[in-house]
Every structure is written in C-alpha cells, then in structure tokens.
C-alpha cells in the first residue's frame, strides 16, 4: 500500500511505446513517478533539487535507486530533474520493469523517502552533491561550445518568465555556501517531505511496449496528411510546392557580402601581444617533487598525480587501463564504492 494514502490522488496515465519485432513485451515497461517542484524562478530550490537527484539516484549506492534495484523493480533505475521551465519536475524512472508492479514501485520509493526524512540524509552524499555542482558551475566547461553563447542560453532559464531576472542563474556561488549550511539543519529532508511525499501535483506514468506501433502511427499520419491534401484546392497545393522550393533555395543560397560583414570578427588589435606567463614553481612535499602553477582557476584546485611506470612488466601494461577504469568504482579496505565516491566528491 502507498503510505499516507496519496497514491490515490496522483494523476495516472498509461501509454504505449513502439518496439521492434522480436523485442520482448514482458518486463519491458517504463514506470515513472513525477512531481512538479515549485517555480523555475526559485534558483536555490532548483540547485537543491539537482543535488537531491545526485544524492538519491545518481551516486553509486544512492538509496532510492538501490532500494528499487534490490526489489528487482526494473533492470535500470534513473532520475531526471527537468529545469529551465517555469514548472520544473522531478522524475524517478524504472526501465525494463513489470507494468503490474507500479504500486510496489511507488510504495518502495515513498517508504525509502520516509525513512530518509525520519533518519536524515547521508551528509557525505549531500556534501558531495553540492561540491559536484559547485565545481561544474565554477569550471563552466562547455566543451567546444563558446562560453558566452552558453551563458546567453542560460539566462533564458529565468528571463523568459521574469524580465527583471535575466541573471538569476548566473549568480549561484552564494547559493552553494548557503546549501552547505542548510544541509546540516534538515533543509533537504524538508524538501523531500514537502515536494516528494506531500506533493499532490504528481503523476504515475506507465509506458507499455507494443509491436507494430510505429507502423500504425506512420499509417495514421499518412492518412491524416492524405485527407488534408484532398481538402486543398489545386491552387493551394501549388502554393505549398512553390513555398517549399523557395525555402529550400533560400537555405542553400550563398550569403551576400553585406550579410557576411555583419558577423563580428576578431581583429589583430584584439589579440594581446604579451604571451601568457607560465608558472612552474618546483618544491618538495615529503620527498615528492611538486610543480605548482599559479594561474586563475575560479577557485578550483586541480591536482594531478603522476606515477613512474617504468618498472611495470610489458605483459601487465594493458591492465593499467583496466585499473584506471575501476579506481573509485570498487570497494576498498576502508570504504564501500558508494562511500568512496562521495568521499572523493566531498
């Protein structure tokens, strides 16, 4: 049974999704528990729920994920927090599950969350989650995408819904400091109680596999388009064809010199003539050589440990790659892999 009786008031939806011929239909459903979380303009709340998703579902041994896997609810369990919209929502999903176990799915989630509220969150997991997202925010590594472009996109997370708050999501550093203090005062447990347990703006959605559904949908679309075409006059059809050709020609044509000149470009005068100074301050710590590079890192400390491997036999060298891959993901003498993961991030 679902605790607190709230399971009866959730919106319930069952839908089908397409699978290929030969794909299993049994134990191949998706079960999801979804809750709307406050307002997208509440930056602290949104950052806090990103941390909660990490602590409850993403980190190795995360309690909600582990409880569902231990109960064999689905072959994979994951969470999502959809922000950047006015009504963000938090989802817990079991993949490759039995569609008839949705009540058990819900009961395990709620029971686990109630235990967490009663006994408290794992403080190391919270600390690790907060530090993880603070690190990502400070580093702002957008790979090959220009940082200015990505910041420009980020401002829309708040600006779309309040013209007076374009920079709300660019000013997060103080929030991480605040969350570190609030984590010790029951803040995250209160969020779980309010938004994940007592929240009635929620749904239980089940996706059931169906063979041939893609072909059915294609046939329905073709029929709909055919009916629409038959409703058009000859002139209307010719106009659609002409508009399509015009659009294709516009997309393929070369840009004019005038248009190209509107693209801002760097000038030689924009590039500094002075080279970037490299700092390689060498000193020793406990007999180990340390090279220190004093450069701006936005408050992030980077540490690289380099080991001399010349004494590793040639036949064992391939296993060094395996060792690198499992470090941090297996139990050690003093920590389980879940504890170790949080210790590293904390």
Give residue ranges: language-model regions:
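M16 family metallopeptidases and their MPP-like homologs
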Residues: 28-38, 65-181, 202-210, 216, ...
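Short beta-strand/turn micro-motifs at beta-sheet edges
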Residues: 19-22, 77-82, 291-293
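Single conserved hydrophobic/aromatic residue that forms the stacking wall/gate
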Residues: 1-6, 10
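Short, low-order "capping/linker" segments at domain edges
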Residues: 11-20, 137-141
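Extended catalytic-interface subdomain
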Residues: 27-35, 39-43, 47-53
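C-terminal regions of mature proteins
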Residues: 129-294
């Amino acid at each position: 049974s679902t605790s607190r009786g709230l399971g009866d008031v959730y919106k319930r939806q069952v839908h089908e999704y397409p699978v290929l011929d030969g794909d299993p239909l049994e134990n191949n459903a998706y079960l999801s528990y979804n809750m709307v979380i406050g307002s997208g303009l509440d930056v602290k709340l949104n950052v806090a729920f990103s941390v909660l998703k990490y602590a409850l579902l993403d980190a190795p041994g995360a309690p909600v994920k582990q409880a569902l896997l231990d109960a064999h609810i689905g072959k994979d369990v994951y969470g999502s927090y959809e922000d950047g919209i006015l009504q963000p929502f938090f989802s817990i999903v079991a993949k490759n599950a039995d569609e008839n176990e949705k009540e058990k799915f819900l009961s395990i989630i709620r029971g686990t969350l109630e235990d967490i509220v009663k006994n408290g969150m794992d403080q190391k997991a919270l600390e690790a989650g907060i530090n993880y997202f603070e690190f990502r925010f400070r580093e702002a590594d957008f790979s090959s995408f220009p940082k200015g472009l990505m910041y420009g996109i980020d401002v829309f997370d708040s600006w779309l819904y309040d013209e007076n708050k374009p920079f709300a999501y660019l000013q997060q550093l103080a929030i991480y400091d605040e969350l570190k203090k609030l984590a010790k005062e029951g803040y995250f447990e209160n969020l779980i109680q309010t938004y994940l347990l007592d929240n009635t703006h929620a749904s239980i959605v089940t996706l059931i596999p169906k063979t041939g559904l893609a072909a059915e949908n294609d046939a329905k679309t073709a029929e709909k388009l055919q009916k629409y075409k038959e409703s058009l006059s000859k002139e209307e059809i010719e106009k659609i064809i002409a508009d399509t050709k015009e659009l294709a020609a516009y997309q393929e044509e070369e840009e004019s010199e005038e248009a190209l000149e509107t693209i801002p470009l760097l000038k030689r005068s924009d590039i500094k003539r002075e080279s970037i100074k490299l700092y390689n301050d060498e000193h020793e710590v406990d007999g180990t050589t340390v090279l220190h590079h004093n450069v701006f890192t936005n408050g992030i400390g980077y540490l690289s440990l380099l080991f001399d491997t010349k004494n590793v036999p040639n036949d064992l060298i391939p296993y060094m790659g395996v060792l690198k891959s499992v470090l941090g993901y297996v139990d050690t003498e003093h920590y389980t892999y879940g504890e170790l993961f949080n210790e590293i991030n904390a």
